[in-house]
Amino acid sequence: MGMTDPIADMLTRIRNANRVHFKSVDVVYSGVNVNIAKVLKKTGYIGGYDVKKDEKGHDVLKVYLKYPDSKRTIINDIQRVSKPGRRVYVKGDEIPKVLNGYGVAIISTSKGVITDKEAREKSVGGEVLCKVW
């Protein structure tokens, strides 16, 4: 049986690995997950990512986490907003700020998967995938 929400699975794996200070975490490969990883890398929340093959030949997205020191984490929390049972869409002029601009919302738009700031600049709306701070 297939997975219902690969994005929520990815965010949960990153959140759990982050809490125990893992250097990297393997997540399910999907195009949207790769695009979310690109945005997280660009905004500085993760160190990087790679697409590798597992022993069965399936693609796996390996996300490299980063930490400022041994006690603190860069990602305080990462939450799914739009879910399969309740999609959340925003218009270009109605995009809310996450923690008054401190955090980042990742939005799937017609211009690709971008941050809330980029969506506001381009005045495009879309589906709010998740929030990170």
Swiss-Prot record:
PROSITE patterns: RIBOSOMAL_S8. InterPro entries: Ribosomal_uS8 (IPR000630), Ribosomal_uS8_CS (IPR047863), Ribosomal_uS8_sf (IPR035987). One of its GO terms (biological process) is translation. Pfam families: Ribosomal_S8. NCBIfam families: PRK00136.1. HAMAP family: Ribosomal_uS8_B (MF_01302_B). One of the primary rRNA binding proteins, it binds directly to 16S rRNA central domain where it helps coordinate assembly of the platform of the 30S subunit. This is Small ribosomal subunit protein uS8. It comes from Syntrophus aciditrophicus (strain SB).
